[in-house]
Amino acid sequence: MTKKTSLDMARITGETAWIPGMIDSHFHSQALADQGIDPRKLLEELARHGMGPLVDVAITPEDTARTGDLPAHYPGLYRSCGLHPVASGRQDWRDALDLIGRNLSEGTFSALGETGLDWYRAYAPRERQQEIFQAQLSLASSHNLPVIVHNREADQDCLEALRKADLPRGGIMHCFSSPPDRVAAFLDEGMYISFAGNITFPSARELREALLRVPADRLLLETDAPFLSPHPHRGRLNHPAMVAFTYATVADLRGQHLQDLVRQVAANLEALLGEAPLNTSRGG
């Protein structure tokens, strides 16, 4: 497959404001690679345009193994590893969790995830998903790492698992999609709330109400690339620079200057994950 690399920054900057330092708290380098994007060249181009820190989220140990050299291509690349609910039906899930634990022991990962519960799709029986989620929460706790949580129509069960885990560093509710009245409960569990490109959709009224309930110091923004492209690019391949459209929408909804939002969200990511990693090659 031919590897594409262009970000089409001329189109992005022609349609919305671009401010260096914008972060992306959640993207999938290996899913982009599977779509024909060379993640190394993509990261180098993002760096040239002044993109801020990024969180590369692996959803299986196999994905994790493919990301080990990526920090050499981008200053400020955080790495996370976990077992996504989409992989909860695999027969070797216990072995996968053991491998995730060994990866975390290397000390080169900034978070555990993506993990969580998905009651919308029957990837595996609920009991299996819950066992895998709880095991990963325990790993996050034992390694003193934040957790990146996927929650699809499983609010109460996610909250109960987080309360039981009592994570020392909380984590991120990725691509938040819960009702507005759930925001406070997740904040109480030490979670940051991250919004993706779907908040730019004009129909996202409830999601926009939830946004307004998030304190400034607990807000994160993401792409979930290559998925969930923001308006007006809905349905097209997503990548981290497209987060600019989400920033513009969020700044408008919150009545905030865009530059102030960029600074605040970057500070929030650093407060949760620590100082951005150096531009050095890492194992994994």
Identify the function of each model-found stretch:
Residues 1-284:
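Mid-domain alpha/beta scaffold segments of enzyme catalytic cores
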